[in-house]
Design a protein with these regions (language model features):
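Active-site-adjacent beta->alpha loops and helix N-cap segments on the catalytic face
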Residues: 3, 32, 55-63, 83-92, ...
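N-terminal amphipathic alpha-helix/helix-capping segment at the start of soluble metabolic enzymes
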Residues: 1-21
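Glycine-enriched alpha-helix->loop->beta-strand junction motifs that scaffold or abut catalytic
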Residues: 41-43, 95-101
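Helix C-cap/helix->beta junction micro-motif
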Residues: 41, 73-75, 127
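Hydrophobic faces of well-ordered beta-strands that scaffold small-molecule active sites
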Residues: 19-25, 45-49, 77-83, 101-103, ...
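Glycine-rich tight-turn/loop motif centered on a GG-T
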Residues: 18-19, 49-56, 99-116, 142
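N-terminal active-site wall of soluble small-molecule enzyme domains
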Residues: 8, 30, 48-49, 53-96, ...
Length: 142
């Protein structure tokens, strides 16, 4: 029950009329805190890791932490690589066990972005991994 695909959580939330929190986790304290709060509220949870935000933590350290914590959770938890900008990073995340990847090709032309997103979808789905694609840019900066 615990480690699930994000699209499953989204479909259930849509049918049930509720939202699923999607929180970033950069260290074990954050991850376990997010899961404990979700368990306390009996809420599903999506845990994400954004390499550009937490560049000091290698994927091979961060993603297994998220995946293993999700598997131990008492509520459904999806794990997602956020803003993967290239095929190799996406593949590494899939091999490390995440249930979802987000491909961010927003710096590419629209046509190239769609093409690469489609290629990633084929590979990811073969491994049972959900894909979110970023096909445009929202103005502003963080």
């Amino acid at each position: 029950m615990s480690h699930v695909r994000i699209d499953k959580l989204q479909r259930q939330a849509g049918k049930g009329g509720y939202a699923v929190p999607h929180l970033l986790g950069s260290n074990i304290e954050m991850v376990l805190g997010h899961i404990r709060a979700a368990e306390d509220k009996q809420s599903p949870l999506a845990l994400g890791f954004a390499p550009e935000v937490f560049s000091m933590i290698p994927l091979e350290v961060s993603l297994p932490m998220l995946v293993n914590a999700a598997k131990r959770a008492k509520v459904p938890v999806a794990t997602q690589l956020e803003h993967g900008h290239d095929f190799d990073t996406i593949m590494q995340a899939i091999q490390l066990g995440v249930s979802s990847v987000m491909f961010d090709g927003s710096d590419l032309s629209y046509e190239e972005n769609v093409k690469q997103t489609q290629e990633i979808v084929k590979v990811a789905h073969a491994f049972g991994v959900a894909v979110e694609g970023e096909l445009g840019c929202v103005g502003g900066s963080a």
